[in-house]
């Protein structure tokens, strides 16, 4: 019939940070093949699926992925060869069964995910469809409102800013292409402003600038200045989104948040909640991701009660794209959105399950890249297939980020008049003003 898996190949390639990662090819009987490469994160949740690394310090500083590749060749491939590539759920379940651990530590989530994504791409190609059409069927027509990273701090840079990502969202755009144009204009305007103030305009892992700003507040202030100077209205045309990655600032022993790159302040959960409440009043912020640490569920509840009806509160480290953690969050009334990172959970099937659970509970979902990326554009197709309406995939620089935006521009063109861009209305989990 031609749609059965004939062969699976795997290799070690290099990601955007110069670290090894896994790439897999799934080849069907008729010669059709799908290829996928796996990303990796800098700040990772403690409950994430395990990214299998070799640990041999003499090779790639211990970050080699040859064990994961051997697992694909020796364990996964023999079991999947002969199976139908058109049954994604069966493929993914077979790999989960072969691994048998909650965090995929036996085979490695990087091994499993590469095969999961490559299978879907092979199946799509076999049917003459794009991956977004194959995975999303007739519902795949919503282009995402992008979260574009323009200032980096924390673990993603080497500066005096505590918070990891300051992003802009073109909520007033009419199309995805227009959103990218608006974001690019602000990005270039910001570069000029930073340069004029004597700041460096080198970029971090995700393509945003990493200037040695004097404070966390200054990051918001220069972004607002750039939005205005580019000819847009902050909060109406373009809003700010944050990922402070506070799990990186949290000391579980003292239960304090340490602003270690700036003031050295130590804040209690209550003080951290008040900190964000003041920022939301002061700046045109529409979304905060990981505003509290992943271990601080009580703090998360307080934050949600305080500002969950004003802005989107996204759980990344908190939920790690995992339905069991998301279920707990929904039951507790914690956060109102989930970040979707395919490599946090490890298969496309589980990713779809997490998004479905979020939507049923009235939570939004944002498909996300990782700080260590490749030229693979699967998540661009995935965000359209899932219809989540939001994507987080870095800045308006670095090809590993731009590749995703360019793929979405192509998809928008292909969809023609059926393409939809929802802008601000994607925030259905918060009360609209």
From Swiss-Prot:
One of its GO terms (cellular component) is membrane. SMART domains: Enolase_C, Enolase_N. Its main location: cytoplasm. The keyword Cytoplasm applies. Pathway: Carbohydrate degradation; glycolysis; pyruvate from D-glyceraldehyde 3-phosphate: step 4/5. Its cofactor is Mg(2+). GO terms for molecular function: magnesium ion binding; phosphopyruvate hydratase activity. The keyword Secreted applies. The active site is at 206 (proton donor), 341 (proton acceptor). (2R)-2-phosphoglycerate binds at residues 164, 341, 370-371, 392. Its EC number is 4.2.1.11. InterPro entries: Enolase, Enolase-like_C_sf, Enolase-like_N, Enolase_C, Enolase_CS, Enolase_N. It catalyses: (2R)-2-phosphoglycerate = phosphoenolpyruvate + H2O. Binds a second Mg(2+) ion via substrate during catalysis. Pfam families: Enolase_C, Enolase_N. Keywords: Cytoplasm, Glycolysis, Lyase, Magnesium, Metal-binding, Secreted. Mg(2+) binds at residues 243, 289, 316. It is found in: Cytoplasm; Secreted; Cell surface. GO terms for biological process: gluconeogenesis; glycolytic process; symbiont entry into host; symbiont-mediated evasion of host immune response. Catalyzes the reversible conversion of 2-phosphoglycerate (2-PG) into phosphoenolpyruvate (PEP). It is essential for the degradation of carbohydrates via glycolysis. Belongs to the enolase family. PANTHER family: ENOLASE. This is Enolase. The lineage of its organism: Bacteria, Pseudomonadati, Spirochaetota, Spirochaetia, Spirochaetales.
């Amino acid at each position: 019939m031609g749609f059965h898996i004939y062969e699976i190949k795997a290799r070690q390639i290099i990601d955007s940070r110069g670290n090894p990662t896994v790439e897999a090819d799934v080849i069907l009987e008729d010669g059709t093949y799908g290829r996928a490469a796996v990303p990796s994160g800098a700040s990772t949740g403690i409950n994430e699926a395990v990214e299998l690394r070799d640990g041999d310090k003499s090779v790639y500083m211990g970050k080699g992925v040859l064990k994961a590749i051997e697992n694909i060749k020796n364990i996964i491939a023999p079991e999947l060869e002969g199976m139908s590539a058109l049954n994604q759920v069966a493929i993914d379940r077979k790999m989960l069964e072969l691994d048998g651990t909650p965090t995929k530590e036996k085979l490695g989530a990087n091994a499993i995910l590469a095969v999961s994504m490559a299978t879907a791409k092979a199946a799509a190609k076999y049917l003459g469809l794009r991956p977004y059409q194959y995975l999303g069927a007739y519902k795949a027509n919503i282009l995402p409102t992008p979260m574009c990273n323009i200032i980096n701090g924390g673990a993603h840079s080497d500066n005096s800013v505590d918070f990891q990502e300051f992003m802009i969202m073109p909520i007033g755009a009419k199309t995805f292409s227009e959103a990218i144009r608006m974001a690019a204009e602000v990005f270039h305007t910001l570069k000029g402003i930073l340069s004029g103030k004597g700041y460096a305009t080198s970029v971090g892992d995700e393509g945003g600038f990493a200037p040695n700003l004097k404070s966390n507040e200054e990051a918001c202030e220069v972004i607002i200045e750039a939005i205005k100077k580019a000819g847009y209205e902050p909060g109406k045309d373009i809003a700010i989104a944050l990922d402070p990655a506070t799990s990186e600032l949290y000391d579980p022993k003292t239960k304090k948040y340490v602003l270690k790159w700036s003031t050295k302040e130590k804040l209690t959960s209550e003080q951290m909640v008040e900190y964000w409440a003041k920022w939301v009043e002061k700046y045109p912020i529409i979304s905060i991701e990981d505003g509290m640490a992943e271990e601080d569920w009580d703090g998360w509840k307080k934050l949600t009660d305080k500002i969950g009806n004003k802005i989107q509160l996204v759980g990344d480290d908190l939920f790690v794209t995992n339905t069991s953690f998301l279920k707990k969050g929904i039951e507790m009334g914690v956060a109102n959105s989930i970040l979707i990172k395919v490599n946090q959970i490890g298969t496309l099937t589980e990713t779809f399950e997490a998004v479905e659970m979020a939507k049923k509970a009235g939570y939004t979902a944002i498909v996300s890249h990782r700080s260590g990326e490749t030229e693979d554009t699967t998540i661009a197709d995935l965000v359209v297939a899932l219809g989540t309406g939001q994507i987080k995939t870095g800045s308006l620089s670095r090809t590993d980020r731009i590749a995703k935006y360019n793929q979405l521009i192509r998809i928008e063109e292909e969809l023609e008049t059926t393409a939809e861009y929802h802008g601000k209305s994607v925030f259905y989990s918060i009360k609209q003003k």
